[in-house]
């Protein structure tokens, strides 16, 4: 189950901890299945968000994976390919995949995380060509 918080990134950490974190903890504690916690624009909130109780922290495309890994209590990160890159062509996607892979490898070498799950660093944009998604998955399998 993924708890997807599109608005958390508008808050500072103090307000997040007071007005959002207790409810995120309650929601995540109410389900007995693997949980992912993701927020948009939440690079500075990742530490607080990782206290909500999920097994996986989703990372949006605005923060490098190795930086995110230093901010969380999670051993598993998910993300963080920029969904706009699906409009930029295969070469741009391939370069981004290589960059993200390098960031993940650095985080793993430091012992910050164990595992990475590939995903977009936010939702699929409405006008994205489905074939671009298929090609991105193929590139991830080749490069990632």
What spans do the regions from the language model cover?
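Active-site loop segments of alpha/beta catalytic cores
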Residues: 1-144
């Amino acid at each position: 189950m993924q708890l997807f918080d599109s608005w958390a990134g508008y808050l500072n950490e103090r307000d997040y901890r007071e007005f959002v974190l207790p409810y995120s903890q309650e929601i995540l504690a109410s389900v007995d299945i693997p949980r992912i916690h993701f927020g948009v624009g939440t690079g500075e909130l990742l530490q607080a968000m990782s206290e909500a109780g999920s097994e996986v922290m989703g990372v949006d495309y605005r923060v490098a994976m190795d930086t995110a890994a230093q901010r969380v209590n999670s051993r598993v990160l998910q993300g963080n390919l920029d969904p706009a890159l699906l409009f930029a062509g295969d070469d741009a996607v391939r370069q981004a995949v290589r960059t993200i892979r390098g960031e993940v490898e650095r985080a793993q070498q430091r012992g910050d995380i164990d595992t990475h799950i590939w995903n977009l660093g936010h939702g699929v944009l409405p006008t994205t060509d489905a074939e671009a998604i298929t090609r991105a998955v193929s590139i991830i399998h080749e490069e990632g």
